[in-house]
């Protein structure tokens, strides 16, 4: 756990020693990378055995996960109890891999295996993080102000991924979606909220530090 925390801290802070840190954990703690949620689910199902638990995790500021057939777990203690405690035959269970929990719901708790679904709220571009909030309808808006409240929001968003990336005891898969590169008949993006460039930089960065592609 200590080595994983150090690795995640290095990953999020662009530490130049990140590849060496990954070498210290990869033999006993698998982390795999994919752009396909179907493959991520298959990996979790293959590795989760007996009474072990797996689950999908997303940040609270993630927004475009429905096209990947993922819902966010409803707020409230009852939903969280079902997600964490029901067995794999119960559709409310984390093991069903349909409802994703956020950093708020998993803070201080662990699963055996996780899939961290990395949305366009946190994007790696040119060796730094850019932060975005979705307006709920049509577009992402960058969180780039220099006010104290804006700086605090960016700090929270980065820490949310720190929480998500440290919830698995045994191993995890990180899914950075492909986005949608399709065009309408008029030549406009089919889905301007999931353009490939929102995700590609993050995927390339994670790949560059040595994470294996599925």
For each feature predicted by the language model, list its residue ranges.
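Conserved helicase/translocase motor-coupling segment
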Residues: 1-129, 151
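C-terminal accessory regions
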Residues: 96-213
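Short, Lys/Arg-enriched charge-dense amphipathic segments
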Residues: 11-20, 204-214
């Amino acid at each position: 756990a200590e080595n994983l925390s150090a690795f995640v801290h290095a990953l999020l802070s662009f530490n130049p020693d990140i590849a060496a840190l990954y070498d210290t954990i990869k033999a006993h703690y698998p982390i795999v990378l994919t752009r396909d949620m179907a493959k991520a689910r298959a990996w979790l199902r293959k590795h989760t055995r007996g009474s072990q638990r797996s689950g999908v995790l997303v940040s609270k500021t993630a927004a475009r996960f429905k096209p990947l057939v993922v819902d966010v777990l409803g707020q409230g203690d009852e939903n969280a109890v079902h997600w964490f405690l029901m067995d794999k035959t119960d559709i409310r269970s984390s093991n069903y891999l349909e409802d994703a929990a956020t950093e708020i719901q998993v803070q201080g708790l662990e699963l055996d295996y996780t899939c961290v679904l990395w949305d366009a709220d946190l994007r790696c571009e040119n060796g730094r993080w850019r932060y975005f909030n979705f307006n709920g309808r049509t577009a992402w808006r960058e969180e780039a102000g220099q006010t104290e409240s804006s700086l605090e929001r960016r700090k929270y968003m980065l820490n949310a991924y720190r929480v998500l990336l440290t919830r698995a005891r045994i191993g995890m898969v990180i899914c950075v979606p492909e986005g949608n590169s399709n065009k309408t008949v008029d030549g406009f993006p089919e889905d301007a909220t999931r353009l490939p460039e929102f995700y590609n930089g993050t995927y390339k960065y994670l790949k560059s530090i040595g994470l294996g592609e599925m």
